[in-house]
């Protein structure tokens, strides 16, 4: 996903020097499901073991000239592995990306699909090269990956937040993320 675009933009320069400060910050939305996670196995079965990469690997051409499946450079990185996250951070930072804006899911009063930020980003040795922020994905989690293009989409997780659950989201974010030195701020204010 993200690593592919960053590697191409960086020309494969993994060890490029730090970039000078600039007036404009470049933000990349980080979709956090490029790894195995419990809900994915629950939704799509035990064979679904590489996260969204399973969909990439099984992509089929839909028309002449549509080249599928494609293999990402530098490979199928595990979004929950700190070493793979270090690669993504290096690729992104070297390509001029300043901030990962994390898709952040909160359903039923608790955070879900947080493995990439908890197990990888916060444990990456080079995380100081990349700011991050949370973008609360306030939508139903639907099955976007249907084998046919019919319009119906099964709701995998529904929105039924109570005010107390929303406050739980804020409390969790304050306690776990907003105090991190890499958490992105604009004009001294937290971005959420």
Predicted regions and their residues:
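Bacterial N-terminal signal peptides
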Residues: 1-9
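Boundary at the C-terminal end of the N-terminal hydrophobic targeting segment
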Residues: 9-15
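Glycan-processing catalytic domains of CAZymes
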Residues: 17-192
């Amino acid at each position: 996903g993200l690593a592919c675009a960053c590697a191409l933009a960086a020309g494969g320069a993994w060890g490029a020097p730090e970039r000078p400060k600039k007036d404009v910050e470049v933000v990349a939305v980080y979709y956090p499901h490029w790894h195995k996670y419990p809900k994915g196995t629950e939704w799509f079965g035990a064979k679904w073991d590489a996260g969204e990469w399973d969909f990439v690997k099984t992509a089929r051409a839909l028309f002449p000239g549509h080249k599928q499946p494609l293999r990402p450079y530098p490979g199928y990185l595990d979004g929950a592995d700190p070493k793979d996250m270090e690669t993504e951070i290096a690729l992104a930072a070297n390509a001029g990306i300043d901030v990962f804006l994390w898709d952040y899911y909160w359903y039923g009063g608790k955070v879900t699909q947080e493995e990439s930020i908890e197990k990888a980003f916060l444990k990456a040795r080079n995380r100081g090269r990349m700011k991050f922020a949370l973008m609360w994905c306030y939508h139903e989690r639907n099955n976007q990956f249907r084998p046919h293009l019919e319009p119906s989409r099964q709701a995998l997780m529904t929105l039924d937040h109570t005010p107390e659950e929303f406050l739980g989201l804020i409390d969790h974010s304050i306690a776990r993320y907003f105090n991190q030195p890499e958490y992105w701020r604009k004009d001294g204010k937290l971005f959420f």
